């Protein structure tokens, strides 16, 4: 028996939609990253983009456990000397682009390379419940029912 190796032309990509309301960020991010890479499939091939197209809605209503909402810091650098900036997860979630907390969590679980950038392109994250992908007929994936630890009261 030969080891199966998927060809890019043989891959059938599905569209899935996940409602992030009340879900724990890290637990949601691991499951989304696994779907984006295609590791949930028996036909997974490391060098081929065989994952699904994932739509995440209500990303502004994700939950961080413990004191991470106040204490977790996100850093960026302006490019100038001494130009490191930090923002708390709370300020980002209450700010203009609250979906970035979830995007960064998922991005950091995907390999950093050409294939990883393609796989991140298959992710669409929306802060609210509205999304423009109804024409793709996405399949609903209920993350909350997989494990009781996946949800947390806000």
UniProtKB/Swiss-Prot annotation:
The keyword ATP-binding does not apply. CDD domains: Ribosomal_L13 (cd00392). Pfam families: Ribosomal_L13. Gene3D superfamilies: Ribosomal protein L13 (3.90.1180.10). Keywords: Ribonucleoprotein, Ribosomal protein. One of its GO terms (cellular component) is cytosolic large ribosomal subunit. Transmembrane segments: none annotated. One of its GO terms (biological process) is translation. GO terms for molecular function: mRNA binding; structural constituent of ribosome. InterPro entries: Ribosomal_uL13, Ribosomal_uL13_bac-type, Ribosomal_uL13_sf. HAMAP family: Ribosomal_uL13. This protein is one of the early assembly proteins of the 50S ribosomal subunit, although it is not seen to bind rRNA by itself. It is important during the early stages of 50S assembly. Belongs to the universal ribosomal protein uL13 family. NCBIfam families: rplM_bact. Part of the 50S ribosomal subunit. This is Large ribosomal subunit protein uL13. The gene is rplM.
